[in-house]
Amino acid sequence: NRSIDLLENLVEITGNRKNISRRGYVLSTRENNIRDLIDQLRFGLGSKSSSLIRYHKKFNKNNYRANSNYDFLDKPDGVDVLQDQKLIQTNFPSFSKDIKTILHIRKGGQINSQQIAEFMMNFCKSNGHKRIKGEVKSINLTDHYTLQLQTESGMQSICVDKIVNAAGPYSDKVAEMLDIKLPIFNILQQKIAFPDHLKAIPRDMPFSIDLDKQSIDWSSDEKEIILTDPDLCFLAKQLPGAVHCRPEGEGDSQWLKLGWAYSTEKMNISRKPELHKYFPEIVLRGAAQLNPALKKYYGKLPKNFVHYGGWYTMTNENWPLIGPMVKEGAFVNSAFSGFGTMAACAAGELCAAWVTESTLPKYANNFSLNRYKNSSLMKTLNKINRGIL
């Protein structure tokens, strides 16, 4: 919530309101018993949970609105829990009719992260900061830090009193230069994007996630072939949930994005990760379980579809690391897996507070390496869903 407040404040400052939507995130399931999900919501919302979670168990079109064109700053906060199938179908007509529960997390949406980043870079430049592009080759600690950088013009030494390790998938390697082992790893995640010329998905649909585990609807012949391939046979078995779909862009845009973080293999990173050639068809079939109209694209995705991927850097519990990095003057701001844009502003604010020795919020230690000393917190985190998207 803090990070989204800061993002919305940036949008107000820049006047860039047309490039933000706050339709929220919709979590769907075919289950009626959602006690575990509600418990996780209460844990995340804390003392305000009773006022921020609203239940809709009977159809009443006046009590709940999925979307509207009203200003993003006037959008509701909290979470709406829908457990009436007529109400669900009225507001989400593209969803499969077997969906029994919807959790509509209101405070979320879509923003042009590149434009926000450009604004931040220009702000830093106008305040006298200089950006140096290069690769960190070594870090030496004496009474200060000396970084050896490989730049386009050659090697360059930079001496500083404090450093922030915000190297994303390279954060562990940067830490190792200081003989520090961070509890992070990298997994490859892939997505596809394509123009929805068949209008399978309503353009005002929120970012929608199918929470349920599923088996892909291969034909019997396809399944038989898949089972004979040791590298692909897992695709004929039950796969984890959290396949997601969202309309991309505003105005006349027709593009959709689909993603599915079913791979949990810890990998050594490369600058150009090797993508799985079957992923586009796999994620399409997975997403079609929630939005059946996507089946119209089976075996015939538009020729200009885009298949891309990158590294999710994360901890086992999928909470970020923000704060001191063991040695005095060294800090880390990393491990954001799939929620980097959402968390960026609050993460930067929190890291800056650590670096400048300012007053810290109550949650500061929970997002730092200090949390591993809190056995009660870690026990709770290890029980809840990691929520990888």
Describe the role of every protein-language-model region:
Residues 20-25, 187-189, 305-307:
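Short Gly/Ser/Thr- and Asp/Glu-enriched loop/turn motifs at secondary-structure junctions
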Residues 31-34, 103-122, 272-281, 338, ...:
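Short beta-strand to alpha-helix junction loop
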Residues 74-89, 265-266, 273-342, 349-355, ...:
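Flavin (FAD/FMN) cofactor-binding core of flavoprotein oxidoreductases
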Residues 1-87, 91, 240-243:
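Dinucleotide-binding Rossmann-like beta1-alpha1 core, especially the glycine-rich loop
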Residues 173-191, 358:
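Glycine-rich beta-alpha-beta "Rossmann" dinucleotide-binding loop(s) and their flanking helix/strand
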Residues 2-9, 43, 119, 278-289:
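A non-catalytic, amphipathic alpha-helix used as a structural packing/dimerization or gating element
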Residues 96, 102-162, 166-170:
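Helical element adjacent to the flavin cofactor pocket in flavoenzyme catalytic cores
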Residues 196-327:
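Active-site lid/adjacent beta-loop-alpha segment flanking the redox-cofactor pocket in flavoenzymes
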